[in-house]
Curated annotation (Swiss-Prot):
Record family assignment: Belongs to the glutamine synthetase family.
Catalytic reaction annotation: putrescine + L-glutamate + ATP = gamma-L-glutamylputrescine + ADP + phosphate + H(+)
Induction pattern: Induced by putrescine and repressed by PuuR. Transiently induced by cold shock.
Name the record gives this protein: Gamma-glutamylputrescine synthetase PuuA
Length: 472
C-alpha cells in the first residue's frame, strides 16, 4: 500500500510492516493493562458524527491488523441509520464493501463497561488504498495536510455544551431538567458558573471525568452553563487535529452513557428547549510555524496579516458552511436573538456576540474562537469547514470586514441562512467548498441531508393539528 502524504503520521498511510508492528504492540500493551477485556467495539464515524460498527470478541482483535470490511454506504446514512440511495454509495454501486483499518492509538476502555469492553476507531480506505474521500475524518485530514504543507500547524481545542435531562417528560410532554439526585429539587433557574449546580450533579460529573481520564480524553472538567441542567466541558488544546475530534466524539458517547448510568438522559441536541439557550460546539484555533511560534500575532501582540487573511476567508465561507455547522432542522432554532449565539458572520476582540472571537491573552496565546457550530454537528466537518475557510483566505485576496465593537447582534453583517433548505442550497452551490472538501463528499452530504429534510417536512406535528384542526 503506497502512502499519499508522509508528513502526518497517519495510521492508514504507514507501511504495512510498521503499521502491523505498531498495532501488535498497542494490543499487547492494552491487554496487559486490561486483562479482563472480553470484547472490543470497532467504530467508524458517519456523516452525522454517529458511531457505526460492531462488537468483536477480544480473541479476534489481532486479526484486525490487516483490516475488516464495512459497506461504503455507511457514509451515506441519514440520522436514523437508513441508507440514502440518492447519495450513490448504495445499490447503485452494488453495496460494495471497503477495507477499514484501525486508527493507531485509539484502543481504549469503553465507557459502556471499561473493565470488560474496549473500543477502537477504524478508518476506511478505497479500492486503490487511498483514504476513502467521503469519510469525514479523511476530509479533515486532507485539509490539515494542506495547511502543514504550507508550513502552518494548527493548534485546536473543542468546547462542548450539553443538557442533562429527566427521563420523564413534564405534564405537557416536554423535556425537563432532572431533579438533583436523591432529592425532589428540580432546578428551573439559569445559574451560569454555579458551583452549587456542580455539587448537585457531582456523581455523574465525577464519573464523566474519571472515564475521560481512563480513555485518555484530555477534558478540563465541567462548568454549569446558562440554562437549567446545561453544562460545558472543554478539551485541552492540541496540535493533533484528528485526535481533537476523535476525543470530542468519544466524550459525547461517554457523557450519554454516564447519564444513563445515573438514570438521566444527556443530549447534545442544538435546541432542546424553546425558552432556553441552545448548546454549541466552540472551536479555538491558533496557528504555529515549524519552530512552534504563534503566527497569529506580530511582535507587539497585534493581529498579524496572516490572521486577517484567515478571518476574511472564514467569514466569506461561513454562510455556505452552515449546512455543516448546523446539520439538522433543530440546529436552526438555536440562532435567535438573546440566546448567546451569533446570527451573522462577524469578528471582534473579546466579544461574545460575534461569530469569530479573538479572546484575551498575550501574543503567545493569540487565537480565534469559532462560535457558530451547534453541539449536534460532526466535529470533523466543523473543523473541515474552518480549515476550508482558512485556505480560502490564504488563496484569495479577500477584504476583511470591519471589526465589531459592542453588541454584534444589533449590527449589520454577513447573514447566515436561517433555514436548512437555504443552507443546503448555498452549500452545494459554493465552488470553493466543493474544491476544498471534495466533489463526491459534497454530493453525498447534500443528498443525505436533503433527504432527511424532506422526511421531516412530510411529518404532521401535534402543533399543526392543534392549530388547524378546527380553524382551517
Amino acid at each position: 500500500m503506497e502512502t499519499n502524504i508522509v508528513e502526518v503520521e497517519n495510521f492508514v498511510q504507514q507501511s504495512e510492516e510498521r503499521r502491523g508492528s505498531a498495532f501488535t504492540q498497542e494490543v499487547k500493551r492494552y491487554l496487559e493493562r486490561y486483562p479482563n477485556t472480553q470484547y472490543v467495539d470497532v467504530l467508524l464515524t458517519d456523516l452525522n458524527g454517529c458511531f457505526r460498527g460492531k462488537r468483536i470478541p477480544v480473541s479476534s482483535l489481532k486479526k484486525l491488523e490487516k483490516g475488516c470490511y464495512f459497506p461504503a454506504s455507511v457514509f451515506a446514512m441519514d440520522i436514523l441509520g437508513n441508507v440514502v440511495e440518492e447519495a450513490g454509495l448504495g445499490q447503485e454501486m452494488g453495496e460494495p464493501d471497503r477495507t477499514c483499518v484501525p486508527v493507531l492509538g485509539s484502543l481504549t476502555p469503553s465507557a459502556a463497561d471499561p473493565e470488560f469492553i474496549g473500543q477502537m476507531l477504524l478508518t476506511m480506505v478505497d479500492e486503490d488504498g487511498a483514504p476513502f474521500d467521503v469519510e469525514p475524518r479523511n476530509v479533515l485530514n486532507r485539509l490539515w495536510q494542506q495547511l502543514r504543507q504550507r508550513g502552518l500547524f494548527p493548534v485546536v481545542a473543542v468546547e462542548l455544551e450539553f443538557y442533562l435531562l429527566d427521563r420523564q417528560r413534564d405534564a405537557e410532554g416536554y423535556l425537563q431538567p432532572p431533579c438533583a439526585p436523591g432529592t425532589d429539587d428540580r432546578n428551573t433557574q439559569s445559574q451560569v458558573y454555579s458551583v452549587d449546580n456542580l455539587n448537585h450533579f457531582a456523581d455523574v460529573l465525577n464519573d464523566i471525568d474519571e472515564l475521560a481520564q481512563l480513555q485518555l480524553i484530555p477534558a478540563d472538567g465541567a462548568v454549569a452553563e446558562a440554562s437549567p441542567g446545561q453544562f460545558e466541558i472543554n478539551l485541552y488544546h492540541t496540535d493533533n487535529v484528528l485526535e481533537a475530534c476523535d476525543d470530542a466524539l468519544a466524550l459525547k458517547r461517554l457523557v450519554r452513557l454516564m447519564a444513563e448510568k445515573h438514570k438521566m438522559h444527556a443530549t447534545f441536541m442544538a435546541k432542546p428547549y424553546e425558552e432556553h439557550a441552545g448548546s454549541g460546539m466552540h472551536i479555538h484555533i491558533s496557528m504555529q510555524n515549524n519552530r512552534g511560534e504563534n503566527v497569529l500575532s506580530d511582535a507587539e501582540g497585534e493581529d498579524s496579516p496572516l490572521l486577517k487573511k484567515m478571518l476574511a476567508g472564514m467569514i466569506d465561507l461561513m454562510p455556505s458552511s452552515m449546512a455543516l455547522l448546523a446539520p439538522n432542522v433543530n440546529s436552526y432554532r438555536r440562532f435567535q436573538p438573546g440566546m448567546y449565539v451569533p446570527t451573522q458572520a462577524s469578528w471582534g476582540h473579546n466579544n461574545r456576540t460575534v461569530a469569530l472571537r479573538i479572546p484575551c491573552g498575550d501574543r503567545h496565546n493569540h487565537r480565534v474562537e469559532y462560535r457558530v457550530a451547534g453541539a449536534d454537528a460532526n466535529p470533523y466537518l466543523v473543523m473541515a469547514a474552518i480549515f476550508a475557510g482558512i485556505l480560502h483566505g490564504l488563496d484569495n485576496e479577500l477584504p476583511l470586514q470591519e471589526e465589531v465593537e459592542g453588541n454584534g447582534l444589533e449590527q449589520e453583517g454577513l447573514p447566515f441562512p436561517i433555514r436548512q433548505s437555504d443552507a443546503l442550497g448555498e452549500f452545494i452551490e459554493n465552488d470553493h467548498l466543493r474544491r476544498y472538501l471534495g466533489e463526491r463528499f459534497c454530493h453525498v452530504y447534500h443528498a443525505c441531508k436533503n433527504d432527511e429534510l424532506l422526511q421531516f417536512e412530510r411529518l404532521i406535528t401535534e402543533t399543526e393539528i392543534e392549530w388547524m384542526l378546527k380553524n382551517a
